[in-house]
Amino acid sequence: MKIVNIKGQIELLSGLHIGGGDDTMKIGGIDNGVIKDINTDKPYIPGSSLKGKMRSLLEWSCRVVGYGDGSPFTSKLLKEVPEVDKKDAETLLKLFGDKEGAYGITRISVGDCSLNNSSDGMVLSEAKYENVINRQKGTAEHPRQTERVPAGVKFDFDIRVKVLDEDSEEALVGMVKRGLDLVANDYLGGSGSRGYGRVRFHISE
């Protein structure tokens, strides 16, 4: 077995919102806060958020969405996939795991993404006001504040891929990089349709 590290930075091109639970309600406070490290009170990107977004987009890209009930793709559904798409589908199952167990252990591990040192001293929080437009009255209703990490802030990411003896390193690593490209062309976090979560990945190794 071999472990391949894919490291680099995530640069925010627009404000990012990944929600965190608020333990206390503050009068005049922000309605939707971002998730923050409990020790430093600084924002971070959960590895589960990045991994989940990659997997979702890769399932669309590999054309395996629609074979089940909306749950993640499994080997049980592989027989329904056209032969031309099976190679990608199998790589996807190896990378993210298969609850049926046919493809062994999950190969990918995505760590939480902490702030890059270049973000020291930068403003790490902004409040964006949003509302709903009443179509009949033409007025704004239900105003709320959403916290975002501003554009320009960078986070470090660290992805590790287990390559077993029977695996193709090129296929697994290629699938990871394909997933990162898909996220970069879509969005990360919430409210992507409003322009949130545009990111760029800088791979250093």
Predicted region positions:
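RNA-binding basic/glycine-rich loop and surface signature characteristic of RAMP-family CRISPR effectors
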Residues: M1-E130, Q136-E205
